[in-house]
Amino acid sequence: MSAVEVGGAWTERPSILAAPALEASAEKRSLLILKWFLLSLKRQFYIGGGEALKKPLNPFLGELFIADYTDGDATAHLVTEQVSHHPPITAAYMWDEAHGIHGSGYFRVEMVFNSGFGSGAASGLGIDLRQYGHALIHIDRFDEDYLIPAAQARVKGFLSGQLYPELIGTSHIVSSSGFISEIQFSPPAKSGGWLKWPRFGGGKDQRNLFKAVLYRRDDPKRTPLYVIAGQWSGAFTITHCESGRVIETVELSAGTPAVPAETLPVEEMDPLETRRAWKPVIEAIRKGDMADTSRQKARLEDAQREKRTVEERTGAKWEPLFFQKLEGKYELFERLGSATSWPLEQELTDGVWVVDEQKVQKMKRSFRPDSILVE
């Protein structure tokens, strides 16, 4: 699948996404947002939902993914768009109008070879997947915002021939109600100050470990209110610190199943929608025909180059359909990001990308009748 579908990680568990909007306690809402974030990670980094690492297709400029996700009493909607090709930036917007929760974000992924020397958290030969960007979630009922990180990852397993992603470093989620979640990925080389890393299932596979703590922003001691620890790709526990009780054990494969994306039939999609645009390529990949895969990819890429050539010749300026660059100060990011000295890094993402909600709500196919795409 194309990288524009990775945004489905946010919405494939609609009831988990909606849960914070139903919770009266600001502290517990922050915990539920943290839980939602952790549950989204496997889909983001194990592309296709399997246990092996797969590289997604590189989106073309203007590529779209539009889908709904429903489980129980919750329905989440998702629109993602490739808003830049150089550098490659994917923007996403999700919403659940019934529960009054919505969010948008933009991300750039850069692959960098790393020898693994000189960093305890990133030890071992691998490729760094450096992510730039962030997301913001808003809960209408409480007029509350959450700043969501882009986790950093490494591709490991080159020596064994079994590649897998390993998240590294420390990430934060910051809420406007005064709580911070701090997430440390992978056992640090010297785990001073950390509790013993848990082992789930009795097996030897201890990849994808993490530990997260939730504390108050105004607490200089950062006293943990909750600790979540385990495997972000498997199972983890949530512990209430004051009582010492494990209040929940979360298992991705059992207790919190993801639901598939609901989309139009491929033949009814706009030519810019990813599953229609890439259909010949996907079919060739499934047949194992690498020669035809290369031919089909070349056809699509050549069509895109022709479109860019026409725009350059006519002086036409390409603009995204549903997102735009922010003009002026980014006050919400500055207010939340200052809690952890969070850098914006807008020079690495060709600016700050925000959704135009009115355009999303008024969307109507066909989106760009003059688009040059192969069928």
Where are these regions (language model features)?
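Extended acidic, Ser/Thr- and Pro-enriched interaction/regulatory segments
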Residues: 1-22, 27-375
